C-alpha cells in the first residue's frame, strides 16, 4: 500500500533511526510513566466547580451595572485602506472572494487585502511578519485583518490550521499600542479565551513572537498546574492574557486579576468551548468586560449554540466564512478508512507505521478513545521498538509539555493521544493521523484528521472502522464524498441514515469517556509492569534510537 503525496522512498523501518542513541536525555522513569504515584486526577471531570470548596475570601462574580458613558474612551478603528485595495472594483472583490471560498455576512464589510503590505499594519508589525518568511496571507487573514483592524465586532469561521491565530493576534497588538500604558493593579487589555491549555500555550507563543518588538507582555493561565507563577505574572501586569475559562474564573474570584481594562476580547475555537461545557463560564467572564469592547469570535464550525452566543455578546458583527459552513474535511488530506475488527487493529497499526517510517521526518498522531487504551497502545508499541509517547488528561502539565516537545522536535515522532489532550496542538509537519479508535461523533473525526494537511500541506488520515462505529457510517461517507475521497466497498454498507435520536453533529457523544481515568489499572502501567523507561524500556528495548540491534525507529528484528 502507498499513500498519495509520499516521497517515493522504499520501505525502510530504520529510517526513523539515526538519532544517536537514547534521545530521552537519560531522563528518569518518572517521565511519561504510568505508575501514577497519586497524581491521577480522577473525579475532576467537571469544568465548573471542580470539587473544591469556596473559601470565604473569594469574590462573587456578578454582572456589573455598566454605564458606558462614564467609562474611559478608547480607540479601536485603526484600518487605513491601502491604495491598491481602494482601486479594487466590486467585480474584482467578488472574484477574489469566490476564488478563496469566502462568504461575507453583514454591512459595510471592508474589502479583502491580497498582500501583507496591503493590510495596513504598522511597520513594526509588518517587519515581524516578513521575518517569519510567510509568502502571502491565508484566506481568513485576507478578509479577517481589515475586519479586525476596523474595530468592528466580527466572526470568523474557518477550518483548523487556516491561520486564525494571526488573524486576531496582529490586530490585537496594534490595538494595545494605541491604548494608555497599564497602571499598577490594571488587568489586561486583550483577553483571549481558549478551550484547552495546549491551544492557550500555542496562542501565547504566537503573541510572544509578534509582540516582542513592542515589548508587549503576556501570560497564559490554565488549569492543571500550580497557580503561583501565573499569579506572579498577573500581578506584574500583562497586556495580553490567554486563558482557559475555568482557571480565569479562579483568578478573578481570588482577586488576582480583573477585566476592567479589557477592550479587545477574543473567543477562539468557540464551538469547542461550548462543546466542552464552558458556556456558563464564558458568559460569566464576558459579563465582567465593558460592553463597548471589540469582540472577535473564531470557530471551525457554526452550530446554533455558537450562533446564539454571538447574538448575545457581539454588536452588529460582520462575518467571514471560509469554505462551506457544512462540516467538511480539508481537501489536502488523503482519507483512508479500513473496516476491521478490534482484534485486527494492532497488526494494521504496525503495518501503517512501517509504511510511514520510510520518511524519517514523519510525525504521526495516533488517536485512542480512552486514556487506558492510549497507555496500552503506547506500551505495546514501545515493547515492539517504536518511539512512541502518550499524552492524555491524567498527565501532569510538566509531563505533557515534555511529551509535546519530544514530538515537536522529532525525538519521539509517534504520539498517542486522546481527543481532549490533542485539542489545540499545533505541530508543524504532522504527516499522518491514525484513528485507532473512531471518535464518538463526526465533528471530532474532522477535528482529529485536521492535525495533518494544515496550511495547504498534504497529509494522510487512516481510520479503523468497526461494527461498533456503524452510527458514524453515513456521516463519514458524506465527509469523504465531499472531499472527493475513495470510499471502500465494505464501508458503503453503512451508508444509511442513523436511527432515531442521533443528531447529525452531536449525537453519540454520551458514550465517550466511559473508561477514562482508569489509566494504569489492571495492567501495571509502564512504571510498574514494565520497569519504567530507564529499566524496562531503556535497558530491555534500547530506548528511542539505540539497540536492539541497529534499530532506530523500527528495525526491531
From Swiss-Prot:
ATP binds at residues 158-165. GO terms for molecular function: ATP binding; ATP hydrolysis activity; G-quadruplex DNA binding; G-quadruplex RNA binding; mRNA binding; RNA helicase activity; snoRNA binding. Gene3D superfamilies: P-loop containing nucleotide triphosphate hydrolases. A motif (Q motif) lies at residues 114-142. The Q motif is unique to and characteristic of the DEAD box family of RNA helicases and controls ATP binding and hydrolysis. The lineage of its organism: Eukaryota, Fungi, Dikarya, Ascomycota, Saccharomycotina. One of its GO terms (cellular component) is ribonucleoprotein complex. Signal peptide: none annotated. Associates with polysomes. It holds the Pfam family Helicase_C. A motif (DEAD box) lies at residues 268-271. Residues 19-34 have a biased composition (Basic and acidic residues). One of its GO terms (biological process) is rRNA processing. Residues 348-495 form the Helicase C-terminal domain. Residues 1-58 are annotated as: Disordered. It is found in: Cytoplasm; Nucleus. Residues 145-320 form the Helicase ATP-binding domain. It catalyses: ATP + H2O = ADP + phosphate + H(+). Belongs to the DEAD box helicase family. DDX5/DBP2 subfamily. This is ATP-dependent RNA helicase DBP2. It is an enzyme of class 3 (hydrolase). Residues 40-50 have a biased composition (Gly residues).
